[in-house]
Amino acid sequence: MTIKLAIDCMGGDHGVAVTIPAAIQFLAAHEDVEMLLVGQPDVIAAELKRLHATAHSRIHVVAASEVVSMDDPVEVALRKKKDSSMRVAIKQVKDGAAQACVSAGNTGALMAVSRYVLKTLDGIDRPAIATAIPNEKGAGTTVLDLGANADCEPAHLLQFAQMASAMVSVVEHKPRPTVGLLNIGEEVIKGNEVVKQAGELLRASDLNFFGNVEGNDIFKGTTDIVVCDGFVGNVALKSTEGLAKMIGAMLREEFSRSWFTKLLAIVALPVLTRFKRRVDHRRYNGAALLGLRGLVIKSHGSADAYAFEWAIKRAYDAAANGVIARIAQAFESHHDPAGAAVPLSTSAPAADAA
């Protein structure tokens, strides 16, 4: 089966200088993939020429005249830039021309445009942003929400857990992934009212609910999935990235203090290389916008080509494993323990993550 991926080539801090090299590199390793490169044709053509890829048979250029910048407000992306590379790429998914879209554009605009174009799946009130964070077990812990919903109701956290469970079950081939609820302690009496009520809903659900988990459990890999509101999740994600960069900077500083430490660095290079690979945040780039009627993957705006290629891989894996269909199936017959559908707010806040 051929997987067709729509790439928002103009999005992010670096545009085609990152997105197109990453797409070509991914194509070289995956013969079952076709790329729809969306953006300004002359800019895309120039980059393809530079990379000697103008005649690539599995590359198709889709024209889009506008670009959503990293600081464009949501209303500009929605109402004014209707021919943006972001919107046109998402529309490829809606129209069935592509099975997934990858964009490094600004998160608020991407979530708003994706929701407007694709709509949400039946039974889902609010889409959420989910990605894997490195853990000591090596597989990564899937954490959501990472910034789409700063304020949540208990039922929203239950929905996030259901969506993530559906995704992890097919992508990681774990039929019953474990779910943890991020809290300030393991005890059921801990946390604010939203978290405590969410815990009750999760315990009453048919999910494989582990219970409350703390921040350190994300890195231990205590559960496959950790659920929280978007405010907490975004802080956790940015803290993780900052910590990884700080550790790297400290190691470089310590190993460069003297000729002796520089020699030690050479001796330890194989170990340091393996360590860097395990904690390299670029390998975990690519967050899924879960809950939509199509697959959209958000890359970091500052991603380099290596990181963006990993975001493409996330899209490929999710598309190949039918994540959207699996999530839709999970919500077809979901009811609370009393037999009534779980009540959900109809409010829909704008995405908060930067």
Curated annotation (Swiss-Prot):
Database matches in HAMAP family: PlsX (MF_00019)
Gene Ontology molecular function terms on file: phosphate:acyl-[acyl carrier protein] acyltransferase activity
EC number: 2.3.1.274
PANTHER family, per database record: FATTY ACID/PHOSPHOLIPID SYNTHESIS PROTEIN PLSX, PHOSPHATE ACYLTRANSFERASE
This protein's UniProt keywords: Cytoplasm, Lipid biosynthesis, Lipid metabolism, Phospholipid biosynthesis, Phospholipid metabolism, Transferase
GO BP annotations, alphabetical order: fatty acid biosynthetic process; phospholipid biosynthetic process
UniProt name for this protein: Phosphate acyltransferase
Subunit description: Homodimer. Probably interacts with PlsY.
GO cellular component, one term: cytoplasm
Gene name of the encoded protein: plsX
Biological role stated in the UniProt entry: Catalyzes the reversible formation of acyl-phosphate (acyl-PO(4)) from acyl-[acyl-carrier-protein] (acyl-ACP). This enzyme utilizes acyl-ACP as fatty acyl donor, but not acyl-CoA.
Originating species: Ralstonia nicotianae (strain ATCC BAA-1114 / GMI1000) (Ralstonia solanacearum)
Presence of keyword Secreted: no
Pathway entry: Lipid metabolism; phospholipid metabolism
EC supergroup of this enzyme: transferase
Catalysed transformations (reactions): a fatty acyl-[ACP] + phosphate = an acyl phosphate + holo-[ACP]
Location relative to the cell: Cytoplasm
Family: Belongs to the PlsX family.
